[in-house]
């Protein structure tokens, strides 16, 4: 069974890759509103 820390790092990397563009768009919208 893989290490729990390794699984957590892979999951975090997956979340960053999949939600990266959405976070960038959200930041851009907030800066635009300000």
Curated annotation (Swiss-Prot):
InterPro entries: PSII_Ycf12_core-subunit. The keyword Iron does not apply. Pfam families: PSII_Ycf12. It is found in: Plastid, Chloroplast thylakoid membrane. It comes from the Eukaryota. The keyword Transmembrane helix applies. One of its GO terms (cellular component) is chloroplast thylakoid membrane. Keywords: Chloroplast, Membrane, Photosynthesis, Photosystem II, Plastid, Thylakoid, Transmembrane, Transmembrane helix. One of its GO terms (biological process) is photosynthesis. The chain crosses the membrane at residues 7-27. It is a single-pass membrane protein. Belongs to the Psb30/Ycf12 family. A core subunit of photosystem II (PSII), probably helps stabilize the reaction center. PSII is composed of 1 copy each of membrane proteins PsbA, PsbB, PsbC, PsbD, PsbE, PsbF, PsbH, PsbI, PsbJ, PsbK, PsbL, PsbM, PsbT, PsbX, PsbY, PsbZ, Psb30/Ycf12, peripheral proteins of the oxygen-evolving complex and a large number of cofactors. It forms dimeric complexes. This is Photosystem II reaction center protein Psb30. It comes from Guillardia theta (Cryptophyte). The gene is psb30.
């Amino acid at each position: 069974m893989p290490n729990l820390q390794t699984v957590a790092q892979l999951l975090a990397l997956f979340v960053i890759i999949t939600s990266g563009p959405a976070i960038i768009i959200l930041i851009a919208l907030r800066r635009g509103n300000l």
